[in-house]
Amino acid sequence: MVLIKLNIIVAFMLALSGVLIYRSHLMSTLLCLEGMMLSLFIFMAAMITHFHMFSISMMPLILLVFSACEAGVGLALLVSISNTYGNDQVQNLNLLQC
């Protein structure tokens, strides 16, 4: 179980470092955020089954629902930005302008 936890934590940290490294492109950031959410889902599911905490067994599914909503909103924002500006680079956006 220790190796499984270590692998999941390493996957989360790699996705987090991907968010920090590839923050100039919105698509790469969204993919890394999705990797973080999936590693959190696997970690929560493994901990619930390991510690027999079946009273909170719906928490990983709730996390997946919020992850899907986040992905949908992110992709809609990506399509809107790429149609408006022609690319997905974050530094070209002026977010303070209406």
UniProtKB/Swiss-Prot annotation:
Gene field: MT-ND4L
GO BP field: ATP synthesis coupled electron transport
UniProt-listed Enzyme Commission number(s): 7.1.1.2
Keyword Electron transport: yes
Subcellular location: Mitochondrion membrane
GO molecular function: NADH dehydrogenase (ubiquinone) activity
Keyword Membrane: yes
Family stated for the protein in its record: Belongs to the complex I subunit 4L family.
EC top class, as a word: translocase
Transmembrane spans: 1-21, 36-56, 61-81
Lineage: Eukaryota, Metazoa, Chordata, Craniata, Vertebrata
Membrane topology value: Multi-pass membrane protein
Function summary: Core subunit of the mitochondrial membrane respiratory chain NADH dehydrogenase (Complex I) which catalyzes electron transfer from NADH through the respiratory chain, using ubiquinone as an electron acceptor. Part of the enzyme membrane arm which is embedded in the lipid bilayer and involved in proton translocation.
Principal location listed in the UniProt entry: mitochondrion
Reactions accelerated catalytically: a ubiquinone + NADH + 5 H(+)(in) = a ubiquinol + NAD(+) + 4 H(+)(out)
Gene Ontology cellular component list: mitochondrial membrane; respiratory chain complex I
Keywords noted in UniProt: Electron transport, Membrane, Mitochondrion, NAD, Respiratory chain, Translocase, Transmembrane, Transmembrane helix, Transport, Ubiquinone
Name used for this protein in its record: NADH-ubiquinone oxidoreductase chain 4L
A matching Pfam family: Oxidored_q2
